[in-house]
Curated annotation (Swiss-Prot):
Protein name as catalogued: HTH-type transcriptional regulator SmoD
Residue ranges of domain HTH gntR-type in the record: 8-76
Organism: Agrobacterium fabrum (strain C58 / ATCC 33970)
Domain of life where this protein originates: Bacteria
Primary localisation category: cytoplasm
GO cellular component entries: cytoplasm
Length: 234
């Protein structure tokens, strides 16, 4: 079953897109943004929506609004992005991530996964990730079954970690990524640019909860002709 519910509000999507543009260096510290009406027209949104986005950035310390002059970018080390753990960007940098849920099921944990959690079962979540609308990656995520009995697709957010935090009181505080090459799985949708069996970059992630326990393990296969894995050291 495919599902795209749980999208962030439009003003938040724009705010997150701008955060990623700053992180990628496409918007730099001190840069003056275009006038609000021009910027809203370029983004295809209402001026009121843009102003909510800019207010969100100002609250996070990423924007300075100078009366009579305009809006200026202020780069900070922690922009508090809901996508702070999402490491894929377009080859040219940045891009707003979105998620399409392909399947959710509670199953026995596969033997080939690293040991994690206290339950013998986990919630397997398969998703297609797009960046700026381009199919870029597929994910198979396993959340330990002890955190919740059932996951309902309709209640999920495009930001899975935001869903964990707001619905399950689970905070992902740290993550370890291990990158290698792997074959695209058979369940990959046709819209993903690499065929099943093709060798692509693959990321194994072990995600820790606020108590230090590994709560989630995931695999991500990404299309290297669309995206890059980016880790910035500050």
């Amino acid at each position: 079953m495919k599902h795209t519910g749980g999208s962030l509000p439009m003003y938040m999507q724009i705010a997150e897109m701008l955060v990623r543009e700053v992180a990628a260096g496409r918007l730099i510290d001190g840069e003056k943004l275009a006038p609000e009406r021009d910027m809203a027209a370029d983004l295809g949104i209402a001026v009121g929506t843009l102003r909510k986005s800019l207010a969100e950035l100002q609250e996070r310390g990423l924007l300075e609004r100078v009366q009579g002059s305009g809006n200026y970018i202020r780069a900070v080390s922690d922009p508090q992005s809901v996508y702070a753990f999402f490491r894929l960007e377009l080859i040219e940098g940045g891009g707003l991530p979105t998620a399409e849920v392909l399947d959710v099921a509670r199953l026995a944990k596969p033997a080939d996964l690293p040991a994690f959690g206290t339950s013998t079962e986990g919630h397997r979540i398969r998703r297609l990730r797009r960046i700026a609308g381009k199919p870029a990656a597929i994910e198979e995520i396993w959340l330990d079954g002890s955190y919740v009995d059932t996951i309902t697709i309709e209640n999920m957010s495009e930001s899975l970690y935001l869903y964990y935090r707001t619905r399950l009181n689970l905070w992902i505080s740290k993550a370890e990524d291990r990158i290698d090459l792997g074959d695209v799985p058979e369940w990959a949708p046709e819209v993903f640019g690499q065929k099943a069996g093709s060798s692509v970059p693959r990321v194994l992630r072990l995600s820790q909860a606020q108590d230090g326990a590994v709560a989630e393990v995931s695999w991500t296969w990404f299309d290297h002709t669309v995206a890059r894995y980016v880790s910035r050291i500050r």
